[in-house]
From Swiss-Prot:
Function as written in the Swiss-Prot or TrEMBL entry: Catalyzes the interconversion of L-rhamnose and L-rhamnulose.
Species this protein is from: Escherichia coli O9:H4 (strain HS)
Biological pathway: Carbohydrate degradation; L-rhamnose degradation; glycerone phosphate from L-rhamnose: step 1/3
EC class: isomerase
Domain of life: Bacteria
Any GO BP: rhamnose catabolic process
Official protein name in the record: L-rhamnose isomerase
Gene name tied to this protein: rhaA
Pfam families: RhaA (PF06134)
Subunit structure and binding partners: Homotetramer.
NCBIfam families xrefs: PRK01076.1, rhaA
Reactions the enzyme catalyzes: L-rhamnopyranose = L-rhamnulose
Lineage summary: Bacteria, Pseudomonadati, Pseudomonadota, Gammaproteobacteria, Enterobacterales
InterPro entries: L-rhamnose_isomerase, Rhamnose_isomerase, Xyl_isomerase-like_sf
Amino acid sequence: MTTQLEQAWELAKQRFAAVGIDVEEALRQLDRLPVSMHCWQGDDVSGFENPEGSLTGGIQATGNYPGKARNASELRADLEQAMRLIPGPKRLNLHAIYLESDTPVSRDQIKPEHFKNWVEWAKANQLGLDFNPSCFSHPLSADGFTLSHADDSIRQFWIDHCKASRRVSAYFGEQLGTPSVMNIWIPDGMKDITVDRLAPRQRLLAALDEVISEKLNPAHHIDAVESKLFGIGAESYTVGSNEFYLGYATSRQTALCLDAGHFHPTEVISDKISAAMLYVPQLLLHVSRPVRWDSDHVVLLDDETQAIASEIVRHDLFDRVHIGLDFFDASINRIAAWVIGTRNMKKALLRALLEPTAELRKLEAAGDYTARLALLEEQKSLPWQAVWEMYCQRHDTPAGSEWLESVRAYEKEILSRRG
């Protein structure tokens, strides 16, 4: 520990103590908040089922930065490199298309054995795993419908895929001792004016009920459902809208997923957390950065990321909110993208933990909105960075931008050889 870091740390403790904040307690609380990193940033959502296939489902990864992972071994190595540069607890979020098999496996036939390497790797790295069925980039999703498909056989294929995915998710939780959150997102929708908006939603409702009909141990598996406003090619109608899934999660008591990019550009999910928590047992967050649409840019330490973190901390939702990331930028170094986005999420959580929330509540309850605003703004200038640097030091990770040197070295030694 450098003398400079020690001095900054001691001064920061004093400054925060003056406003009633115990920084050591804040760091202990930060270690209770794992962030689930998404595997698909590492290979532009290609997966291993058909890596040369097209990405469909109304989503898009733009850019052609060299060095993307081409197989599971490379992806795990890249994840390890990124995780070494991110302090504190982490999880990994997998999609079904990241299975490993020597022979082709139909999506409705995936089994835990196809993910055993991921589980062994997670054990070795002390990680929890989360999961997602992959209802896109497949011949049977090519017409834009999956769980709400009008064709019974196609709809059943996707039902069976989701049911198989739940068993994989439960396997993760059983093996790793921490529940796997399995999120269902489907791209179903229509490009232009839709006459019958009801029937697809009726089919989706029945399909989801069949998907979750098998009772699984909640200590191993948690169901979540995710809405979206629109996607490319589904601009006019999305079957799984916000209202549909809020109603579903409320009535079936599943977790609800709120994705930062899946709403109108003027909406923010930070304002939805406290409302949804009144009706659903748990929330899954997909923290992202939409630029004009669901562009999935790398997460910044911006106002909305901070507001999301503050909602979790202010309302003590540590055990009811699962924090995941969802972005994929192929125009920059993919490992750097993971590091930047995940560190920013953790910085936002730390800043929220360093807020004098009790004092702010008193001011708000007393109607002293002048003092509330003044204190909120003044606390932004408190030396939270010194606390962050100590947190990084204790977790043996770089405190500042020196992490980029490690990424550049890895890029030169490993990524540059991938072609």
